[in-house]
């Protein structure tokens, strides 16, 4: 199992970028689910 993570494909830039963007999107979605109005502040 650890041999899979040591290959060059998993460490390549598109895979790392896809994992990073998915993680960031998940964090933003969950934050917006628990605190719905904190991401978009009104201009008042």
UniProtKB/Swiss-Prot annotation:
Listed GO CC annotations: photosystem I; plasma membrane-derived thylakoid membrane
Gene Ontology BP terms: photosynthesis
Swiss-Prot/TrEMBL keywords: Membrane, Photosynthesis, Photosystem I, Thylakoid, Transmembrane, Transmembrane helix
Residues annotated as transmembrane: 9-29
Record's subcellular location: Cellular thylakoid membrane
Keyword Thylakoid listed: yes
Membrane topology note: Single-pass membrane protein
Function: May help in the organization of the PsaE and PsaF subunits.
Protein family according to the UniProt entry: Belongs to the PsaJ family.
Matching HAMAP family: PSI_PsaJ (MF_00522)
Protein name, UniProt field: Photosystem I reaction center subunit IX
């Amino acid at each position: 199992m650890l041999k899979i993570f040591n290959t060059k494909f998993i460490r390549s830039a598109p895979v790392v970028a896809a994992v990073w963007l998915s993680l960031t999107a998940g964090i933003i979605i969950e934050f917006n689910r628990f605190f719905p109005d904190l991401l978009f502040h009104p201009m008042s």
